[in-house]
Design a protein with these regions (language model features):
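Structural beta-alpha unit
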Residues: 1, 41, 77-110, 211-245, ...
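Small/aliphatic-rich secondary-structure junction motif
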Residues: 1-56, 135, 152-221
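Amphipathic coiled-coil/heptad-repeat helices and related helical stalk/stem segments
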Residues: 19, 96, 125, 166-169, ...
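Gly/Ser-rich helix-loop-strand patches that form or flank binding pockets
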Residues: 20, 25-29, 99-148, 236-279
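A structural preference for short, hydrophobic beta-strand core positions in alpha/beta folds
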Residues: 36, 88-91, 142, 185, ...
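A short acidic, glycine-rich active-site loop
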Residues: 56-71
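P-loop/Walker A phosphate-binding loop and immediately adjacent motor/lid segment at beta-alpha junctions
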Residues: 74-82, 120-144, 206, 210-219
Length: 279
């Protein structure tokens, strides 16, 4: 089992090259076809026409970004040729929230970057990460804006709550889990889950995964006072040297998580390791 078609989203941020390198490593590992999708945020021109000289500013910004995209395309073709990876390049013809999910549905795995508050080029579209993971129907691998993550997939942490989303994520991550040196199923409790008695226990999930992987263990932990499940997961991942976190996304109603926060948003904002999410 493996990913035979990988889609990587590339933008004009400083981390685009590192994301491409990671995608190339995975394409070689799984003998997969690699598609790069260039999609960047471009403001509507009408928003610039309210002030004198703003139209010229918009034109200059667009030309500068077009130059960076062209350079990125040349780099992509050079790197895939060097790595002998089957590849193609797609330039988005619409807003990212429309075009990226559409192309993602043709892939086995989608790779995108984490938003960096210090790099405006990582802003792609309104709530882009949330929209993608909810609408793509494919596993999305979010890559942090720091680090090279060379060991990705050797030590996997599966966040488990017995939900449909958790089951989907675990199975979507199976190509990683099958070759991992260690897989840990971690169930984080906070004592406030009304459906806990009907969810699949972590031990049962570990037993299922053990039929695919060589070293699987299970860990049940409780959130400390005032701690969130998302922060607890990230802390445990750091403490155990995990290099891939696998989790279901938006198990609660999306409006509730977007308004009140939640595990998904906490992890997307604070992650320091790659995170594979499925909905």
């Amino acid at each position: 089992m493996g990913y035979k078609s990988i889609l990587v989203h590339l933008d004009t941020s400083d981390r685009a090259h590192a994301r491409l390198e990671l995608a190339l490593r995975l394409a070689r590992r799984f003998d997969a076809h690699l598609t790069a999708l260039s999609a960047i945020y471009t403001p509507e021109p009408v928003s610039f026409y309210v002030m004198a000289g703003s139209a010229d500013y918009f034109r200059e910004q667009r030309e500068r970004r077009d130059e960076r995209v062209a350079a990125l395309e040349r780099l992509f073709h050079a790197e895939t040729t060097r790595a002998k990876v089957s590849a193609d390049w797609i330039a988005a013809d619409a807003r990212a929230n429309t075009v990226v999910p559409r192309h993602a549905r043709h892939a086995d795995l989608v790779i995108v970057g984490q938003s960096d508050p210090n790099d405006p080029e990582t802003y792609i579209d309104d709530q882009f990460p949330e929209n993608l993971v909810l609408s793509a129907g494919r596993p999305v691998l979010f890559v942090p804006y720091a680090g090279d993550h060379a060991s990705l997939g050797e030590r996997v942490l599966v966040a488990w709550d017995g939900s449909r989303e958790a089951v989907r994520a675990a199975h979507d991550a199976m190509p990683f889990i099958e070759h991992a040196k260690r897989t840990t199923v971690v169930a984080v409790g906070n004592g406030n889950d009304p459906d806990a008695n009907v969810r699949i226990p972590g031990a049962d999930a570990a037993l299922m995964l053990a039929r695919h992987a060589s070293d699987v263990n299970v860990l049940d932990i409780e959130c400390g006072p005032g701690a969130s499940i998302g922060d607890t997961l990230l802390s445990r991942a750091y403490e155990t040297g995990t290099d891939l976190l696998v989790m279901g996304a938006y198990g609660h109603a999306r409006w509730r998580e977007l308004v009140m926060g939640g595990v998904t948003r906490t992890v997307l904002a604070s992650m320091t390791l790659p995170v594979l999410m499925s909905h």
